[in-house]
Every structure is written in C-alpha cells, then in structure tokens.
Amino acid sequence: MDFVALDVETANSDPKSICQIGVAVFKNGDLIETWSSLINPQSHFDFMNSAIHGITEEDIRDAPTITDIKSKLDQRVGENVAAIYSGFDKVALEKNFPQINYSWLDITKVVRRTWEGVAYSGYGLANVCKLNDIEIGRHHDALADAVAAGKVLICALNAKKLKLDDCRSLIRRKISTLIAHGKMSENPNPVNIVIEGGNPDGEWFGDVLCFTGELRMPRVEASIKASQ
C-alpha cells in the first residue's frame, strides 16, 4: 500500500496561486516521510483565503516559487499513486505544470463508495477524520491535511478489504450501485432537504446535481423530479 498524499493551499480563488504544499509518503500503509513548503504564488492574497489557512503575504515573502520546488515534489511522488482529497489539488498543480503526469487518485471518490453515511454529503476531510477517529492536526495546513487524507485512504481500503490497485475499478462504479437509498428523509428541513432514492433507470441516477438561479418550481420539487 504505497502512495503519496498531496495537499495544497492557495492565496486566492485562482487554483494556480499555490502558497503551501504538503506531502505525506506512505509505504506498506505506514507514514514514512513528510515534507512541506510555503510557496510564493507571485499573486495577491485574498482575505478569505488567509482567514482559512492563516498564510499571509509576509509569510511567503522569501519562499520559493512552485517551479523552484517541482524537483523536490517529483522526487517524492516518483511512480507512486498521487492521492488527493478532491480534485482541487490536481487542478492547482496542473495549472502550474500542464505536462504533469502523476498517477492521480481522488480519495473522496473512494470515501463516498465506502461509508454510506457520507456517500452523498458530509464527506469533507474534517468530518471523515472525525468519523474514523483520525487526528487531523491543524485543518487547512497543507501537511496536516495531506497526512490526514492518507490515513483516511488507508481506513477506507481496510474497511472495504481492498488493495490500492483495486481503487480504480471501485471509483468507476456509480455510488448508487454500492450505496442503497430508498425514500425521502422523514420530516426533512425544507432548507436542507435530502432526496434519497430515485429511479435506477433515470438519466441522472447516481449523479450529483446542482440547481443554480431561479427555477419555475420549488427546489424540493425539482429535486424529486430529477431523481425520477
């Protein structure tokens, strides 16, 4: 069970603006190496981003650029699976290095197919760590998140009794074929309603839809129609 877990933090809404990277190297399921670096994104910092991760322009004034540390990153990833918690980290690195050719694995796709309680919501890193008694350290520190994400992946593989190589076939399967749903939640909160179930032959069965803008019907009704 050899893989490298990666996490990045950004200075602003542009995925390219990486200001910190964290790397956790796992071998045979054990954490054997960690590495992190602040990054000068050569871009501005948004207040909201700094409020989340605590990194400011002053912190990265003398930090290397993402190009400066690329060789160190490649050295640690090598031919291993590059495990990330959601596709954002992959997008951020690909924005900086369009030719990057890592063997990516999105841990959230494994998580959502492992535990029924987080199949459709609640699969954020902090919540999944809490459910599995994993200490996350300082959330939104890139290294702490990388280590925690790697431990979550190991928990998921152990829960499913799978090897790392089995993940590819697992995440190709629709969640709905693995996690059973049958009815609308009883007494739902109309602001935060969850529609469970649906027509297995429906066009969007097993997918996640997001309604934006004004609709010609209440969102609850639209959700029910979409599930059919």
Language-model segments: residues:
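Conserved non-catalytic scaffold segment of RNase H-like nuclease domains
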Residues: M1-S103, G122-H140
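Short, glycine/acidic-enriched loop or turn micro-motifs at the edges of active sites
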Residues: T10-N12, K109, A148
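Short coil/turn segments
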Residues: Q42, T114-V118, L215
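Acidic, Mg2+-coordinating catalytic module of metal-dependent nucleases/exonucleases
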Residues: V81-G87, V91-A92, N96, G124-E186
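Short, structured loop/turn "capping" segments at alpha-beta junctions
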Residues: S103-L105, S121, K160-D165, G202
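Short alpha-helix plus adjacent loop in nuclease-associated cores
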Residues: L105-A126
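DNA strand-break repair and replication-stress modules
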Residues: L162-Q228
